[in-house]
Amino acid sequence: ALLSRDSDNKVQPGLAKSWDISKDGKTYTFHLNNNMCFSNGDKLDADDVAWSINQLKEKQYYNANQVESLDKAEAVDANTVKLTLSTPDSNLLWYLTGRPGLVFDKNAKYNAKTEAVGSGPYTVESFDSASKMVLKANAKYWGTAHKPATQNVVIRFLTDDNAAVNALKSGDVDVLSPVNATLAKSLDASTYTVSAADGSDKFVLAFNCTNAKLKDKRVRQAIRYA
């Protein structure tokens, strides 16, 4: 992403190595790292950044509401991007560590459902929603701080908690996340390291508006007020 977060959830450089904010809080200027490229070899520059952010708002993709105050994103030069806002937004830097800050290759032609073109240390070699995703070290990765530590990473999707813990105990997997508190207690502290942290999951209670009674707005309001 254009920006990143550290383990304390504080905003850090990402594709942008630094940035400036105008006194009125309505102009953000981002200075990009040099010599960046996508996994397909295409150069990653300010045009890609500006295009990606503008597309997010124009097409109203996921989290487009987070850049609601954006008037436009533009490439000043190959390594400089300027974001102009209609009103100041103190959350903008934080938002640019997430979906609004994702940068896509504006010139790439590929099927986004089956392929991925990114700029990180790994590329997606294969994906099966029922079993696993295989990541491969990106030979064209431009960064120095997060060089791939291993050539391949296999992420398996284990739907049964007990089976997942047994896979860890048998050595079938090296890392397990998440693991519920009850099963975590069964792991030998001398053999395994169990880490706990705040989660970012969101739980939503939504109305099924195909239900005859819930179609009535007054019923939904009454439930909400209860």
Language model: regions and residue ranges:
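Aromatic- and charge-enriched surface segment that lines or borders ligand/interaction sites
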Residues: 17-60, 76, 82, 213-215
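N-terminal lobe/hinge region of extracytoplasmic solute-binding protein
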Residues: 1-23, 54, 117
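Surface-exposed binding/hinge segments that line
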Residues: 20, 24, 65-105, 126-128
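Ligand-site clamp/hinge motif
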Residues: 110, 140-186
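Alpha-helical secondary-structure segments
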Residues: 45-52, 78-84, 120-121, 149-152, ...
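Ligand-binding "clamshell"
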Residues: 185-196
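Gly/Pro-rich hinge or "lid" segments in bacterial periplasmic/extracellular proteins
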Residues: 10, 96-148, 152
